[in-house]
Amino acid sequence: MPRLLRLAPLMLAGTALGAPGMAQEAAAPAVTATLSADKPGSVIHRDVFGQFAEHLGHGIYGGIWVGKGSRIPNDGGYRSDVIAALKAVNVPMVRWPGGCFADEYHWRDGIGATKSRPTKVNTNWGGVNEDNSFGTHEYFGLMERLGASTYVSANVGSAPPAETAQWVEYMTAAKGTTVLAKERERNGHAAPWKVQYLGIGNELWGCGGNMRAEYAADLTNRYAQFAKSANGTMLKIASGPSDSNYEWTDALMRIAGKNIDGLALHYYTRPRDKNWSDKGAALGFPEREWATTMSHTLEMETFITKHSAIMDKYDPAKRVMLAVDEWGTWYDPTPGTNPGFLEQQNSLRDAVVAGLNINIFAHHADRVKMAAIAQMVNVLQAMLLTDGARMVKTPTYWVYDLYKPWQGATSLPITLTSPWYHKDEVAVPAVSASAVRDAAGQVHVALVNLDPNRAMPVTVAMTGLQATQAAGRIITGTAMDAHNSFDAPDVVTPQPFTGAQVAGGTLTLTLPAKSVLVLDLR
């Protein structure tokens, strides 16, 4: 039976109104909210809008990297259209090379002359050949083109600590100072790179080695000890829990908390979550699966709240970040594709899921200081899809475009009382919100209506803010599974929204069904 969700009051105070089936009505009770612009919260780190690129399906090859000899327009082997699209949404950080792939990846396979690099089988994802033509130098070349922070995941599952230590030295040692620095120079890059984040393994409870929490914590201490950046601070991110594995968080924080800078949390939204081989379709789904998707998405609030409470016990100063470095929707693969490639379409439903998650992260900016949606191109809840020379921006991409003002902005308290969206046994608050003040002093408000049928009248009382105008952009559509395709790339795109009014310190509007709206207050 789908779970009934009750959210923490910080995010919104829900008021149950009506009975199941009420979602079919055209009218809706009002949403009321209070925005306290004079009570600033934590800064939302820009890396909360990070991305994830794994050697999986067409996530790297064909999606980002086509090689210098490709007929597809490219800049040194990187797809020109993909680079331009990612830069346009200010991608702040990219995690690489995995994922499960990371704990089978040996960094030396991906350096040196491309023709001399060994070909191996990607046993995690699809059983295809991996020619290692995209390696360390190519990854940093991508980061340089994007102007993004670097997040390298080290192999703990099948490699010794010395391999991680040597990789860090290869990447960060000053020119000419060590044997590995000289090797890097011979391979074409004399200057060292900056590694902002080092992942100490991936999912050590699963594909990273099927470990017990205490054993994983001991290994984390060991690998963290020997991984030393030669050119400044490198934040070490431990392999943390999956969804509600609170015992894992307790063990990692208790045993290794003093030696790490972050703990990774992974959680994927599935419409059907009883059987991993039956997740539900990306398109053509019934409303019930829209509802369960929203309910399961909103569980992120519970997971972050409970994991943060455990972390607070060992780290009351909140030095160790909670890094939600794998999140997003996971559906059954597109029929006819390699199931190991995790290809799926991306619809308006995914846009709403993205907005809900970003709002949750914003409310937990004191602990959640980095996140990475899975994944950036062609895999799972992708920002971009490619097919040969063609590229399309997904609804999720456009949500990231709307939320650009949130990067590095200060979160503002917004409390919300919302009607409930009901479908069969599922009941969830219909509207989610977050608000920020950017570095220039402008206030922005995001509102997400997850009810697919009803528009919501919204009234926001504002304090500490002298706004007189509100305008912005909205993402919505006529169908729950409205999506962009290569033949129709603009079905779901942001549209101007001018239906908001500001008078006497109060913001009023009607929020369309199944929509993500960002308003700029002036």
Q: Which sequence ranges carry the predicted segments?
A:
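N-terminal signal peptide c-region/cleavage motif recognized by signal peptidases
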Residues: G18-P20
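Non-catalytic accessory regions flanking glycosidase/transglycosidase catalytic cores in CAZymes
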Residues: A23-G262, M300-E301, T305-P333, T337-R522
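Extracellular loop and loop/strand-boundary signature of outer-membrane beta-barrel proteins
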Residues: A291-T293, Q345-N346
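Bacterial N-terminal signal peptides that target proteins for export
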Residues: M1-P9
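Histidine-centered catalytic micro-motifs
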Residues: L265
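Active-site His/acidic residue clusters
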Residues: Y268-A291, T337
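Bacterial N-terminal signal peptides
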Residues: A8-A16
